[in-house]
């Protein structure tokens, strides 16, 4: 199964705070960034390094850097923006590509309305970020788009994932690893994750939440 649930105590603690029904926009937004940063730490643990020489205080010293072109972070709009600052706090030199995906509330199917990809994306690791992996349709559509653009290495980070979404991504793109803070129980009849976080986009942006 192409998924890794990160059960670090800090992540579990922060995710518990995010599940509160009475959480403020400010606190939800800050916690989304913090958990995004912690997931980034785990999702980049196996990146390839290369050596190079620098002038240190005592002379030349060999140090390491991440090999290859700069990573591109791919937030799925709009909710993915809520994790972006947390990811960039650890990878400040990353390039940002943006993909806008909207979900039909009746069919639960996704359609892409925006794509702004960085140059030479075929030579970069792409890290997709989205708070929720529910039906998986938005994630699958984004991966489809990236692969069509030539991207060969793709990873995804989500705060909460439903088994249905995991299965959809695994079926369509078994080569893409998903990192999540929690694998939750299920989707309800409206396509919301249970117990989930509610509508993460509305909580991040302070807009009116729909009934689950």
From Swiss-Prot:
Pfam families: UPRTase. Pathway: Pyrimidine metabolism; UMP biosynthesis via salvage pathway; UMP from uracil: step 1/1. InterPro entries: PRibTrfase_dom, PRTase-like, Upp_B, UPRTase/APRTase, Ura_phspho_trans. Catalyzes the conversion of uracil and 5-phospho-alpha-D-ribose 1-diphosphate (PRPP) to UMP and diphosphate. Gene3D superfamilies: 3.40.50.2020. Its EC number is 2.4.2.9. HAMAP family: Upp_B (MF_01218_B). It comes from the Bacteria. It catalyses: UMP + diphosphate = 5-phospho-alpha-D-ribose 1-diphosphate + uracil. Uracil binds at residues 193, 198-200. Signal peptide: none annotated. Keywords: Allosteric enzyme, Glycosyltransferase, GTP-binding, Magnesium, Nucleotide-binding, Transferase. It is an enzyme of class 2 (transferase). Belongs to the UPRTase family. This is Uracil phosphoribosyltransferase. GO terms for biological process: UMP salvage; uracil salvage. 5-phospho-alpha-D-ribose 1-diphosphate binds at residues 78, 103, 130-138, 199. Its cofactor is Mg(2+). It comes from Pseudomonas savastanoi pv. phaseolicola (strain 1448A / Race 6). GO terms for molecular function: GTP binding; magnesium ion binding; uracil phosphoribosyltransferase activity. Allosterically activated by GTP. NCBIfam families: PRK00129.1, upp. The gene is upp. Binds 1 Mg(2+) ion per subunit. The magnesium is bound as Mg-PRPP.
